[in-house]
Design a protein with these regions (language model features):
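Catalytic glycan-binding domains that act on GlcNAc-containing polysaccharides
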Residues: 319-324, 330, 344-361, 366, ...
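N-terminal leader/linker segments that initiate helical-solenoid repeat arrays
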Residues: 36-83, 87, 96, 110, ...
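Short solvent-exposed coil/turn linkers within tandem alpha-helical repeat scaffolds
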Residues: 65-74, 98-109, 132-145, 169-179, ...
Length: 730
C-alpha cells in the first residue's frame, strides 16, 4: 500500500475512511519504466520509485513544460500528477488535475479509476460510482478493483440494491474483509439480516484483527442490532490471534465477553479461559494477576494444567530463573507424560542444559528426547543440538555419530546442510585436513552460510577455493517475448509500471516451469517489480541459479532495487550496500509495502517505535507508521541504524543478530559465547529465529559482494571482535 504523507483535506469518516486507506493502491501507479516512457525524466522516475515527497512537484513541473511545448506525454504526466495528489490526500486538487487531459484508450480505465477515487474521498458517491463503472470493462486486474469500488460507492450513496451484485462479484474475485463488511452492510440495508449476520460472523472469525472486523464489532456493540453469536471456541480462537499479535488488552476484552455472554459453563472451559488470561496478564506485566489465573488453569483437566505449568516455566526462563524453570519442566515431564506439554518440557530440559554448558547432560537428555517422542517434529533439532553439545565438549566421535544419524534418519530435514558441514568441521578439529570435503560443501550449498564457511575453512587450510559463480548476474537480453505478456508490456510502455506489475503478478499462478519463470521474472524485473520477480525465482529457479549457475536466474534471486539510493545511503553510513541488500532480502523480500504480524513495515521492516527513536537521533520529526512504506524514508532510517550497529558490533554476524534480536541481547550473547569461532557462536545463539536470520543475512551479504562488488572478495572473519562498550542501545 502506498502511504499518504497527510490526510485528505476532505477526510472521509467511518467506513469510508477505512476504504480511503484500502483504496490507495493506485497512489503511485503511473511511473515510467525505462526508455519506454519518454515524457518523464530519469530524475522523476527515481523520485517516484522512492516515493519522495518532491515527486509531485517534479511531476507538475515536467507537466507544465510538456504542456507548454505541446509534447505527446502530457496525458501520462497529468495522470501521474493527479495520482500523486490523490496519494498526498488532496482529492479535490487531484480531480481538477485528472480532468484536464483525456487519456489514450489504454490509459482511460486507469484515469477513470483515479477520478472515482477522488470523487469518493470528497463524498460525491454517485459520481464516484459512475467513474468506477467506466473502468469495469477494462481488460485485466483493474476491472475487479473497479467493480469493488463501484459497489462500495453505490452503497455509500444509499443504493444498496445496485451495490450488492457488484460487491458480490468483487468478493468472488478478490475476497477480503472490506468486501465482506460491505456485503453485510448491503444485505442489512435490504432487510436480509440473516445474510448480514452470516457475513459479520465470517468477518469476525476469519479476520479478527482487520479494521473492518474491529469497526463492525464496535458498531454492533453501540447499536440496537443483535450481536454476532460466536461460540466459545471461536472466542478463544480470536483471543489467541490477538495474543500472538501482541494485543493483550484486546485479548482480555475478548475473554471478558466470553464470560459475560455465558459461554464459560464448565470447569474445563474456565481453565482454558484462565490459561489465556494468564498469558495476557504476563504480556501486560501484571504478574500477580497472571499467577492467580494460572492457579485456576492448573486445577483444570490434565492437558490445560500441563500447559499452565509450561507457561509458568517459560515465565521463569524469561526472568533468568533457570533452576526454578527446570524444576517445573521436570515436574511436567513426570506428572503429565503423554500430554503435548510434556514433549516441549523434555526438549527444553536438554536445550537448557546445553545453554548452561552442561554438555554431557544435554547430549543425554536430547538423545532421550528422540527416543521418548518418536513422532515429534523436533527430533532433527534435538539430534543436531546433541551433536553440538558433543562438539563443544570435544567428543569428536560422538559428535560425528549424532551428525551421521541426523543425515540418515532425517534426510529430508533442512538441517542436513549444517550436519554435513559440521561432520567435515569435526574431521578437521580431530586433526584431519578435509580439503575435498569442504570443496564438496561449497559446491553443494554455494548460496548458504555453510558454503561461505567452507570457503573460509579452505583458505584457513592453505587452499584456494574454486570459484563457484563465474559470471556476474544480469538480466537476460535473449528472453523471448510471450503472448501472455502483451498487456503488461503495453502498460509498461505507456508508463504504468505498477499496473504492469499487477498484471504480471496476476499471471504468476500460471507459471509452472523454469523457462516460463525466467521469461515472466525478467519482465517483472524490467518494470521494477523486484519482489514479485524474486518470489517467482525463489519458487522455480533454484536449479538454474545454483546448479546451472545461470546469471539471469541469479539476477532475479539477488536483485538490487533502488540501487543508486541504496549505494549512496550505504556510503553515507559507512556500511556495505551488500549488507543492506542482504537485510532487505531477508526482511521483506524487496516488498516495499510489506506489513508483518508484529506491525513492522516496509523494505527493512522497521517497527514504528524504532523508527521514532532513529528520527529523534537524527533530529527529525517521528514518521507516521504508514510513512515507513516509503522506500526512501525506510532505507534512510534503517541504513543509519545498521551503520550504528556496525560501529558497535563490527562483525556482520553480530550486526545481523543485533538487527533481529536487539543490541542488548546480542551483547549478552557475546559476553557468554563470544570466545567461540563464528560458526559455533551462531549455532549456539539461543533464539531459533535469530540463528536462521544471521545465517541467511551473512551468506547473502557476501554473495552480493561477490556478485556486484570489486575484484577482491571480502573475507569473513572466523573470530568475533569484542563489541564497543558504548554505542546504540535500542
Amino acid at each position: 500500500m502506498v502511504p499518504a504523507s497527510r490526510g485528505p483535506r476532505t477526510r472521509p469518516r467511518g467506513r469510508a475512511r477505512r476504504l480511503f486507506h484500502a483504496g490507495r493502491w493506485l497512489a503511485l501507479c503511473v511511473v515510467a519504466a525505462g526508455p519506454a516512457a519518454r515524457g518523464q525524466s530519469e530524475r522523476l522516475l527515481e523520485a517516484t520509485r522512492l516515493q519522495r515527497a518532491s515527486a509531485l512537484e517534479m511531476a507538475q513541473a515536467e507537466l507544465a513544460t510538456c504542456t507548454r511545448k505541446g509534447c505527446a506525454q502530457a496525458p501520462q504526466l497529468s495522470l501521474l500528477a493527479g495520482s500523486l495528489l490523490l496519494s498526498r490526500g488532496e482529492p479535490r486538487e487531484a480531480l481538477v488535475q485528472l480532468r484536464k487531459h483525456p487519456a489514450p484508450p489504454l490509459l482511460a480505465p486507469y484515469r477513470s479509476f483515479a477520478i472515482g477515487q477522488a470523487y469518493f474521498y470528497i463524498r460525491d458517491f454517485r459520481a464516484a460510482a459512475q467513474a468506477f463503472q467506466e473502468a469495469t470493462t477494462a481488460p485485466g486486474v483493474v476491472a475487479n478493483r473497479a467493480v469493488a469500488r463501484a459497489g462500495e460507492a453505490l452503497l455509500r450513496a444509499g443504493e444498496a440494491g445496485q451495490a450488492l451484485p457488484l460487491i458480490e462479484r468483487a468478493l468472488g474475485a478478490l475476497g477480503g474483509p472490506e468486501l465482506l463488511s460491505a456485503r453485510a452492510e448491503a444485505r442489512a440495508a435490504l432487510g436480509d439480516l440473516g445474510g448480514a449476520q452470516a457475513d459479520l460472523h465470517t468477518l469476525m472469525v476469519r479476520y479478527p484483527r482487520s479494521q473492518a472486523a474491529i469497526d463492525a464489532d464496535a458498531e454492533l456493540r453501540g447499536s440496537s442490532a443483535p450481536a454476532v453469536a460466536l461460540t466459545l471456541d471461536e472466542r478463544l480462537q480470536r483471543t489467541r490471534v490477538f495474543l500472538d499479535a501482541g494485543d493483550a488488552k484486546v485479548a482480555l476484552a475478548e475473554l471478558d465477553r466470553s464470560e459475560t455472554n455465558g459461554l464459560v459453563r464448565d470447569p474445563g472451559a474456565r481453565a482454558q479461559v484462565a490459561l489465556l488470561r494468564a498469558q495476557a496478564f504476563f504480556a501486560l506485566n501484571r504478574a500477580e494477576d497472571a499467577e492467580d489465573a494460572l492457579a485456576v488453569a492448573a486445577a483444570g483437566p490434565p492437558a490445560t494444567a500441563a500447559e499452565a505449568m509450561l507457561v509458568r516455566a517459560r515465565r521463569l526462563l524469561k526472568l533468568d530463573e533457570h533452576t526454578k524453570a527446570i524444576e517445573r519442566l521436570q515436574e511436567i515431564s513426570k506428572k503429565f507424560a503423554g500430554e503435548p506439554a510434556s514433549e516441549e518440557a523434555d526438549y527444553f530440559l536438554g536445550w537448557l542444559a546445553l545453554q548452561e554448558g552442561k554438555l554431557q547432560v544435554a547430549a543425554e537428555a536430547l538423545e532421550s528426547f528422540e527416543k521418548k517422542h518418536p513422532e515429534s517434529r523436533r527430533r532433527d533439532e534435538a539430534c543436531f543440538f546433541r551433536a553440538l553439545a558433543q562438539i563443544r565438549n570435544g567428543n569428536w566421535a560422538e559428535a560425528d555419530r549424532a551428525l551421521r544419524e541426523l543425515q540418515d534418519r532425517y534426510s529430508r530435514s533442512n538441517l542436513v546442510p549444517q550436519a554435513k558441514y559440521w561432520r567435515v568441521r569435526v574431521k578437521q578439529l580431530a586433526g584431519g585436513k578435509p580439503l575435498d570435503d569442504y570443496q564438496d560443501i561449497l559446491k553443494l550449498y554455494p548460496q548458504t552460510f555453510y558454503g561461505l564457511l567452507a570457503q573460509e575453512r579452505l583458505r584457513e587450510l592453505g587452499a584456494k577455493p574454486e570459484p563457484i559463480f563465474t559470471e556476474r548476474p544480469h538480466l537476460s537480453s535473449k528472453v523471448a517475448a510471450a503472448p501472455e505478456l502483451a498487456l503488461p508490456r503495453a502498460l509498461a510502455s505507456a508508463g504504468l509500471w505498477r499496473e504492469s506489475g499487477e498484471e504480471l503478478r496476476a499471471r504468476l499462478g500460471a507459471v509452472h516451469t523454469p523457462e516460463a519463470a525466467l521469461r515472466v521474472g525478467t519482465a517483472l524485473a524490467r518494470v521494477g517489480e523486484a519482489w514479485a520477480a524474486y518470489h517467482l525465482a525463489n519458487r522455480l529457479l533454484w536449479g538454474k541459479a545454483y546448479a546451472q549457475k545461470d546469471p539471469a536466474a541469479l539476477a532475479l534471486l539477488y536483485p538490487r532495487p533502488y540501487v543508486s539510493h541504496v549505494d549512496e545511503t550505504a556510503r553515507a553510513q559507512g556500511v556495505h550496500s551488500s549488507l543492506l541488500y542482504a537485510i532487505m532480502r531477508r526482511e521483506s523480500a524487496f516488498q516495499p509495502d510489506r506489513l508483518s504480524a508484529a506491525r513492522a513495515r516496509g523494505l527493512m521492516q522497521l517497527m514504528a517505535r524504532t523508527a521514532s527513536a532513529i528520527a529523534r537521533e537524527l533530529q527529525r520529526d517521528p514518521p507516521e507508521p504508514d510513512e515507513l512504506y516509503r522506500p526512501e524514508l525506510n532505507l534512510d532510517l534503517s541504513a543509519w541504524y545498521v551503520g550504528q550497529l556496525a560501529k558497535r558490533f563490527v562483525h556482520p554476524a553480530l550486526i545481523a543478530a543485533a538487527y533481529n534480536a536487539g543490541p542488548a541481547v546480542t551483547l549478552k550473547w557475546t559476553g557468554e559465547l563470544g570466545s567461540m569461532p563464528v560458526d559455533l557462536f551462531v549455532e549456539s545463539m539461543p533464539f531459533k529465529e535469530t540463528r536462521a536470520y544471521v545465517k541467511q543475512v551473512v551468506a547473502d551479504d557476501y554473495l552480493y559482494q561477490a556478485f556486484y562488488g570489486g575484484a577482491e572478495a571480502r573475507r569473513l572473519a572466523m573470530t568475533l571482535p569484542k563489541p564497543a562498550s558504548n554505542g546504540i542501545e535500542f
